[in-house]
Each structure stands twice: as structure tokens, then as C-alpha cells.
């Protein structure tokens, strides 16, 4: 079994049922870390609210959800303070508190998402609140 699984290299969470199945899979396979980026803030927030109302943990520890921001005009509704992934547009400067995705600054393109997983950094480090991606 893989130790890390990334959902949606291209795509997003479809609906609440789909997201609940993502949660169930993470609960059923605790030895694997699952992660995704999403712009489906309402779906995620609604499911978290329902889970909290049912006295359940908001999300399994092995399911990492990163809300995708897209500049000043597209801000995530983030009442549960989930971590975020933000675009740094050309000509803009990355805020110092944001972590730059290592894959984007690796000139030889040898660094991959799994490397961050293996090193416990980037998207897999809960202390890092915002991941920066350069516009491409």
C-alpha cells in the first residue's frame, strides 16, 4: 500500500458525498496520508460543521486539505483555519511567512510532492500554514 496519495492532480471535490467518501477512506486506511488542494470551500466547510455537530473529529489526521487561494479576488472562506495554498503572481513578492513549494524552485526538477512527504515538510508539515506556488 502506498504511504501517500494525492487526489485531483487536475480536478476537485465533486460534492458532499464524494468528500465524505474521501474522509471514510482516510479513516479506513490510517497508514496512508491522503491530500488534496480544493476550491470547494463550501463543501468542505459544510461537512466539517456536520462532523463537529455529530461530535466527530473535523478531519482524520491523515487527510490533508489545502484550500486554494487565487490572489486578492479569490479568497477561501476558511472558518476552520485549514491550511492554504496560494498563487504568487508574476511581479508579486511572496510573503515571508509563506513556504515556497520546493518543486517549483528545483532547477533540475528532481523534487516531487513525495519528497516533501518523506522529509515531513511543505504540504505535509502542519506547522506550515500557507504553501506558495508561483504562477506558471
Language model: regions and residue ranges:
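Class I S-adenosyl-L-methionine
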Residues: 1-136
Amino acid at each position: 500500500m502506498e504511504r501517500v496519495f494525492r487526489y485531483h492532480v487536475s480536478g476537485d471535490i465533486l460534492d458532499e458525498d464524494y468528500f465524505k467518501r474521501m474522509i471514510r477512506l482516510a479513516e479506513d486506511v490510517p497508514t496512508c496520508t491522503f491530500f488534496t488542494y480544493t476550491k470547494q470551500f463550501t463543501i468542505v466547510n459544510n461537512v466539517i460543521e456536520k462532523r463537529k455537530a455529530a461530535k466527530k473529529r473535523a478531519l482524520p489526521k491523515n487527510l490533508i486539505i489545502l484550500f486554494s487561494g487565487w490572489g486578492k479576488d479569490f479568497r477561501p472562506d476558511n472558518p476552520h483555519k485549514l491550511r492554504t495554498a496560494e498563487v504568487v503572481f508574476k511581479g508579486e513578492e511572496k510573503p515571508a511567512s509563506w513556504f515556497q513549494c520546493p518543486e517549483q524552485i528545483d532547477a533540475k526538477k528532481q523534487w516531487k510532492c513525495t519528497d516533501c512527504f518523506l522529509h515531513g515538510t511543505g504540504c505535509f508539515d502542519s506547522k506550515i500554514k500557507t504553501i506558495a506556488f508561483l504562477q506558471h
